[in-house]
Every structure is written in C-alpha cells, then in structure tokens.
C-alpha cells in the first residue's frame, strides 16, 4: 500500500468511526514466516478482500420489503470444552446487537442451526 493510500485509509477510518451504526476493521492480507517455525502463515480474510471489513446497522423500512440485503455472519468455532474469551463474547454481542447472525459452533450441526440452513 502506498503512503498516500495509507493516509487516505486512516482518514476514512477516522471519519467513519464517528458513526455509531458502523463497525469497520482494517483487513490486511498477506503471508509472513512464523518466527518459531519458519513456515509461511497467511493472514487476513482472503486474497483480494477489501481493506475495510465490517457491518452497518440498517433499519428495515416498508419500502425495503421484498428486497434482499446481506447480513453479517460471525461464527466462533470451539471444541467441546473450548471457552469463549471475554473479547470473543464482546465481539459476538456487538455483532448480534447490530443485527448480525452470531453463534458458537462446536459441531457442523451447530453451524447449520445458527444459520438456519
């Protein structure tokens, strides 16, 4: 990312951060070597994914009836004994309170039930 693009992204994030109905996060993608193992580790959502990822709370109004809108989904995967951290609980609560679909999946069936598919 060029210096100009970095400055622009910072300015956009500051401006958008003033809106309580928005939650956006910087999404850097790439690969780096793990300093412990030397193996390459990918990070970020996916190659080609956008710089800012998040959600906007939208109130559904009568004129929107029949339209399709995307809904943010956040599923935390845990083993049978795995426990959510406070940070993970806070994340899920914020997404849920903003209208997203959230849940903890310990099995494939859990994930399917969370998404009602």
What positions do the PLM features span?
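Catalytic phosphate/metal-binding cores of nucleic-acid and nucleotide-processing enzymes, i.e., regions
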Residues: 1-117
